[in-house]
Amino acid sequence: MEQLFNDLQQQIAKEMGSTLSLIDEDCGQLEALAGGEDRYPVTFPCVLIGIPETLWDNLASNLQHGKTTVTVRLAFDCYDDTHYGSTQEQHAAERMALSRRLNGCLHGWRFEGCATVLVRRASRQFSLPGGIKIYETEYATTVAEEIQNSES
């Protein structure tokens, strides 16, 4: 699983590194920031990666396949006035284009240790207090893991 996380970070950095300020594991930084905490500082735009669930099936005594969910959150601090006629309307479109570009570098990619390519399953947009806009995409893949049992 750690290889998948590292590979995701590297792929995003390779394809989009110059446009992002931070690529990190999602540890609730945005929710903490929205709650007034600065314990997990973030800079924007950022991508936060989570692997919230894997459902495992046994293939052999020490080999399992897992159906894995990956969440990728692209976040911006939005201080632009993007209402129609503001002359800054393009900023909203630029954020959406960056989200599409992020999906383009992940969807269909086969990462090391994965039995299937990463496939986009769902996406949504939402805002948090403080002018934070989040473009969240959920992906699915299948990973293989060999269990290393320690014998006594």
Which stretches of residues belong to each language-model region?
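Short histidine-centered catalytic/ligand-binding loop motif
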Residues: T82-E94
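Acidic-leaning, charged glycine-interspersed low-complexity segments
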Residues: S18-I23, L30, V42-L48, H91-I147
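Small/polar-rich, solvent-exposed N-terminal microdomains that initiate assembly or binding
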Residues: M1-N62, A115, S150-S152
